[in-house]
From Swiss-Prot:
InterPro entries: HD (IPR001356), Homeodomain-like_sf (IPR009057), WUSCHEL-like (IPR044555). This is Putative WUSCHEL-related homeobox 2. Residues 23-87 bind DNA. The lineage of its organism: Eukaryota, Viridiplantae, Streptophyta, Embryophyta, Tracheophyta. Transcription factor which may be involved in developmental processes. It comes from Oryza sativa subsp. indica. One of its GO terms (biological process) is plant organ development.
């Protein structure tokens, strides 16, 4: 019986010691005075105190409240970890800000480099600014080159001067095969080709009418067709007609004459065909 009572007593004593151990492991709640002193020591440069320093700090802070040596050790360890986290967070924020600034700096530099390039392209290819003047020049060139463009006095004179250099055949007393050049203004006098001395001469309308009326004194028998056939026997001499009813000189293009004469090898000689008739008419011509 006695050993059993001893075991119960020993078990009861163990339970009391366990309760004391549980009571001793309660959470430490530092007072404001203890926290202020610990922070002053930390700002003073103390980061990892040794065992002797921990005992001294514990003895000094025990006057302001309950504290143990392990509480002092863990406080310094946790405070260093919090400082490292704060420093790491600050470094991350600063690195993020620097990367953003670097990115925006390069983006703005690229945009600033693109703007002068676009300005240079607009100066090299002034499509919008020179569209009006370029369009005017193109319209002028097209009006000069296009055959359907309206005739101006300058272009009509240039066309008449160019036509003067082409080889043409003229029929003074026949009806005009083609209408005269279009007139742009009533003041502009049209130009006509006049056959004088075997060559075409450009004369105004009034002078051409005068010369054609003066040349009507000659008979048609004295004129020879372009292909060498005399027209005296076919058409008798006609009296002089008024200048107002006389037809203007018609200009036949070189291409049309070449197409009409394509079937002949060469013009016929009038002396071989009608030697006698021409000799009799030489007195009148002289």
């Amino acid at each position: 019986m006695a050993p059993a009572v001893q075991q119960q007593q020993s078990g009861g004593g163990g339970g009391s010691t366990g309760a004391a151990a549980v009571g001793s492991t309660t959470r430490w709640c530092p007072t404001p005075e203890q926290l202020m002193m610990l922070e002053e020591m930390y700002r003073g440069g103390l980061r990892t105190p040794n065992a002797a320093q921990i005992q001294q700090i514990t003895a000094h802070l025990s006057t302001y409240g309950r504290i143990e040596g392990k509480n002092v050790f863990y406080w310094f360890q946790n405070h260093k970890a919090r400082d490292r986290q704060k420093l790491r967070r600050r470094l991350c924020i600063s690195h993020h800000l620097l990367s953003c600034a670097h990115y925006y700096h390069h983006h703005l530099a690229a945009a600033a480099a693109v703007v002068p390039t676009t300005k240079l392209l607009t100066t090299l290819n002034p499509s919008s600014s020179s569209s009006s003047c370029g369009g005017g020049l193109n319209e002028d060139a097209n009006s000069l080159l296009s055959p359907t463009s309206p005739t101006t006095p300058t272009s009509a004179a240039a066309a008449a001067a160019a036509a003067a250099y082409t080889t043409s055949y003229y029929y003074p007393f026949t009806a005009a095969a083609a209408p005269p050049p279009p007139r742009t203004s009533p003041a502009a006098s049209p130009l006509f080709h006049y056959n004088q001395g075997g060559g075409g001469v450009v004369l105004p309308a009034a002078e051409a009418i005068g010369r054609s009326s003066s040349s009507s004194d000659y008979s048609l028998g004295k004129l020879v067709d372009n292909f060498g056939v005399a027209l005296e026997e076919t058409f008798p001499a006609q009296p002089q007609q008024p200048a107002t009813t006389m037809a203007m000189t018609a200009v036949v293009d070189t291409t049309a004459v070449a197409a009409a004469a394509g079937g002949f090898c060469r013009p016929l000689k009038t002396l071989d065909l009608f030697p006698g008739g021409l000799k009799e008419e030489q007195h009148d011509v002289v």
